[in-house]
Amino acid sequence: MVAMIMASRFNREAKLASQILSTLLGNRSCYTSMAATSSSALLLNPLTSSSSSSTLRRFRCSPEISSLSFSSASDFSLAMKRQSRSFADGSERDPSVVCEAVKRETGPDGLNIADNVSQLIGKTPMVYLNSIAKGCVANIAAKLEIMEPCCSVKDRIGYSMVTDAEQKGFISPGKSVLVEPTSGNTGIGLAFIAASRGYRLILTMPASMSMERRVLLKAFGAELVLTDPAKGMTGAVQKAEEILKNTPDAYMLQQFDNPANPKIHYETTGPEIWDDTKGKVDIFVAGIGTGGTITGVGRFIKEKNPKTQVIGVEPTESDILSGGKPGPHKIQGIGAGFIPKNLDQKIMDEVIAISSEEAIETAKQLALKEGLMVGISSGAAAAAAIKVAKRPENAGKLIAVVFPSFGERYLSTPLFQSIREEVEKMQPEV
């Protein structure tokens, strides 16, 4: 998206710039000192090339890099005027916690262009939840993994597991066949990496996963084998092991057991959350699927501050970590029905069970009230975070919660069933 505002008078420019930044950044602005440039426009352009001007600073307001230029220093000062946000306890915070200036490395040609798609993974933004968090005494900030290249947190482990196996000499492009059981998002994360590096990929997935996921996987060239939905991820794992035995040069990445899974979150996701909150995160909330996100992030944050609470989320219908039994549920991506080896249970202070219905309803409300189109597991994580944020003992605290995937790949699921039925019945107006 490119937005350019031209005006004849710089006061009007500054006012418009402030309004646009306010809207785009949720009434929180990026700011820094900047020398005036020769441009008479405000330019917001993701992934623009580096400017030749030494006075131009680069900003991070989203996963992309944006360029900001103003006709005068006073324009910039006015448009970038600091805004403060009140915590639930009445204190105020510096808005730089939300938007951080960064300097991106450039190639030998000086252009700010990634060499390949894997370089776009990570450094996702965080955003406060507002309307949906009414009645909460703590603040909730969502880590938007929906803004990864393929719109899910699993992009990170797709990259890390393939890269790790390559570095150890286990696989090589054009020869090895990658095999993996998946609920969908890990498969997509693997599929775009496999496509970019030249691997054949075979995925096994419960038939209960969304149609959008199937289409996406096939679009990337992956081979897809559906398994009995009643057997959950256990059935997908068993089928993958069978394929592994019968396929020459096959290699299973084993997301549930692979240390490269939590490692990438320890090395990237955790530090990103810590840096974006300036170490002020009090509670971390994440769904439990493979265990990689909560284990990796939890370890990093606990090392930085042992007092930080780490809270996991699982489906009520399959609450094995809470002492229940595995069972079918509608929260795709969490609640595998078994305890993954990658899950460090000692890192968690609490596990909250959220029903499929509550997860779906919360995901709907995130779209309607926050403008965030997220998947069902994001709804589950948000529902748990809201419960925690309403506890009196958490007044004034900052809760970070991971939103794992984008909602568009759930259009065929119960999440949007009523809307889908409504639009299918729509007729053109005469």
Swiss-Prot record:
Keywords: Amino-acid biosynthesis, Cysteine biosynthesis, Mitochondrion, Pyridoxal phosphate, Transferase, Transit peptide. CDD domains: CBS_like (cd01561). Acts as a cysteine synthase. Plays a role in the sulfide detoxification in mitochondria. SUPFAM superfamilies: Tryptophan synthase beta subunit-like PLP-dependent enzymes. It holds the Pfam family PALP. It is found in: Mitochondrion. This is Cysteine synthase, mitochondrial. The keyword Protein biosynthesis does not apply. PANTHER family: CYSTATHIONINE BETA-SYNTHASE. Disruption phenotype: No visible phenotype but displays lower levels of thiols in roots. Growth retardation. Defects in root hair formation. Its cofactor is pyridoxal 5'-phosphate. Homodimer. Interacts with SAT3. Component of the cysteine synthase complex (CSC) composed of two OAS-TL dimers and one SAT hexamer. Pathway: Amino-acid biosynthesis; L-cysteine biosynthesis; L-cysteine from L-serine: step 2/2. Signal peptide: none annotated. It comes from the Eukaryota. GO terms for biological process: cysteine biosynthetic process from serine. It comes from Arabidopsis thaliana (Mouse-ear cress). InterPro entries: Cys_synth, Cys_Synth/Cystath_Beta-Synth, CysK, P-phosphate_BS, TrpB-like_PALP, TrpB-like_PALP_sf. Belongs to the cysteine synthase/cystathionine beta-synthase family. GO terms for cellular component: mitochondrion. Residues 1-87 form a transit peptide. Pyridoxal 5'-phosphate binds at N185, G289, T290, G291, G292, T293, S377. It is an enzyme of class 2 (transferase).
